[in-house]
A protein has these predicted regions:
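Register position in tetratricopeptide repeats
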Residues: 29, 63-64, 97-98, 131-132, ...
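Helix-start (N-cap) detector for alpha-helical repeat units in TPR-like alpha-solenoids
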Residues: 14-18, 51-52, 85-86, 119-120, ...
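Structural marker of alpha-solenoid helical repeat scaffolds
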Residues: 9-12, 46, 80, 114, ...
């Protein structure tokens, strides 16, 4: 191809690195991930210390679920730019996926030092504290987040999950009730409610909640076992 000929002609030309990087982005938009990876890697062969190009490739690795390769690129970015928001955020995400919770917490803390009050980092801290069973700290952060973002349904659902984990089922139901008012077509809310009702032995209410979830789009086979159990 013409671009490979350009590389052979002037292998060290910086413009070639940019050319490959841009080509990789175009290929990625077209869904040609394998070709895009090759282009990003060619760009990085020419400019191995380019933060932008490392982030581009890391992001694509992450999309393709190549966590270990994405991790290496994000680490290299942080070595070059210790305060890079994107790299800190996504390396923390990778740590969470690997269940390396203390490492994730360290990155979220660093991110909050770089961007005080960053919403993603605050949510990350709440979730990582939950995973570390530091429930009080997790709940306090979720409480602050919900005060700051009262219409964010995902936060209400996340706090409800924490309340279920700590056996505060009535509080969880209150949060899910608030979430349902904000997002009446969110089927997952009704599945969560149904599970809590089952835990409480309120089978009839559980059945109604599961049926509502089916009505809102969850395939019936996915909830078949729950529907059957709640009919007993």
């Amino acid at each position: 191809a013409w671009f490979k000929k350009a590389l052979q002609k002037e292998p060290a030309n910086m413009r070639n690195a940019l050319l490959f990087s841009n080509l990789g982005t175009i290929q990625r938009r077209m869904g040609k991930n394998k070709e895009a990876l090759e282009s990003y890697s060619l760009a990085l062969n020419l400019t191995p210390y380019s933060v932008t190009m490392l982030l581009n490739r890391a992001s694509l690795y992450l999309d393709m679920d190549y966590l270990d390769k994405a991790y290496v690129d994000y680490c290299n970015v942080i070595d070059l730019d210790a305060k890079n928001q994107e790299a800190l955020q996504f390396r923390a995400y990778i740590y969470m996926r690997r269940r390396e919770y203390q490492e994730a917490k360290n990155d979220y803390q660093r991110l909050l030092e770089v961007v005080p009050g960053d919403k993603t980092a605050r949510i990350g801290m709440a979730m990582v504290n939950q995973k570390l069973q530091r429930y009080r700290e997790s709940l306090e952060e979720f409480n602050r987040l919900i005060v700051d973002y009262p219409k964010d349904v995902s936060l209400l659902k996340a706090r409800a999950e924490l309340e279920v984990e700590t056996n505060n089922l009535e509080l969880a139901l209150l949060d899910l009730e608030s979430a349902a008012k904000l997002a009446p077509n969110d089927a997952e809310i009704y599945v969560m409610c149904g599970d809590i009702y089952m835990e409480q032995g309120r089978n009839r209410e559980a059945y109604v909640a599961f049926e509502k979830a089916v009505e809102l789009g969850i395939p019936r086979p996915e909830l078949q076992d729950r529907l059957k159990a709640s009919k007993k």
